[in-house]
Amino acid sequence: YGESVASVISQIKAISNDLENGLDREELQDTLKPGAARNAIDCALWDLQAKIDKTPLYNELNINLSNEITTAMTLSMDSPKKMAAESFIYKTYDLLKLKLGAKDVLESIRAVREAAPYPKLIIDANEAWTLEQIKLWQEELLSLNVSLIEQPLPAGKDSSLSNFEHMVPICADESCH
């Protein structure tokens, strides 16, 4: 979203004196715009505070670890064979997120499902699908136990989904930026 490693490093360097002079997390929110640099510094400041207090970060944040949170293991877009091999490693996980495009969609999902039959699947279509493809694929996606399709259409094209009766839940990503 318009960021690069160089731009993030530049933003961090630009406020390094402020950080050395005690810039805190609250001041950081007004100093840097939302993005990777602010997030990295915010995380580092939380970690620093926990170390100063000699307590685990989850205590600093008042997080009760007895309430586990399920998170998805993300598999990057690749050939169906390579995605299946990677998913096999995570076959005991509860949730896998597959990053896909417009190519080899069903083949990739089938290959992953065969290698990892247990996890729920989230499909991140990366804005690469059309409404016609969703209509064509939705029954098979349902049969492959796909739990969610993330951002199937290009950002700004979501209105075509408003009257669409989908079998698999659909959520936004890039459309929210």
Regions found by a protein language model. Give the residues of each.
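N-terminal capping/lid subdomain adjacent to the active-site entrance of alpha/beta enzymes
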Residues: Y1-L121, A128-K135, E139-S143
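Residue-level detector of anion-binding/catalytic polar loops
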Residues: P56, S147, P169
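Structural detector of well-ordered beta-strand residues that form the stable sheet scaffold
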Residues: A72, I122-D124, E150, P169-D173
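Short, glycine/acidic-enriched loop or turn micro-motifs at the edges of active sites
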Residues: A102, E127, L153-P154, C176-H177
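A short, conserved beta-to-alpha structural element at the edge of catalytic cores
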Residues: L144-D158
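Catalytic alpha/beta core domains of metabolic enzymes, predominantly
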Residues: G156-H177
